[in-house]
Amino acid sequence: MNATNCDYLLYNCTSLTSVDLTPLASWVNVTNCNYLLSSCTKLTSVDLTPLASWVKLTSNSSLLSGCYNLAFVSVLSTPPFTLSSGALTNGNNCPIYVPDDAVDTYKTATNWSAYASRIKPISEKTES
């Protein structure tokens, strides 16, 4: 896939409870992906790791805006991928699980630092 813009992909999918983003890892030319999964009000968890392959990404604001039922977010890539300001503000302050050896890196990374209190080592994850 040669997509460069996936703004509003899966936006307002109000019946979506889970999603596998693995196929998006092959979309290596994406530069903009604002509002991805935004307003998916029944989504309970998401693994954002596949987005790490988007090395050209410059904007991904409001990724999870309005996802009020999220129990957790996981991101198992190192280093942290580019994150726009406010991208993970979802209203419920759920934990963001990252690799154990990368917790400090995530907590100090640009725009990730805004979520430092929510960033936890994946080894502490108890939710399914």
Which stretches of residues belong to each language-model region?
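Solvent-exposed loop and capping/linker segments of extracellular ligand-binding repeat ectodomains
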Residues: M1-S128
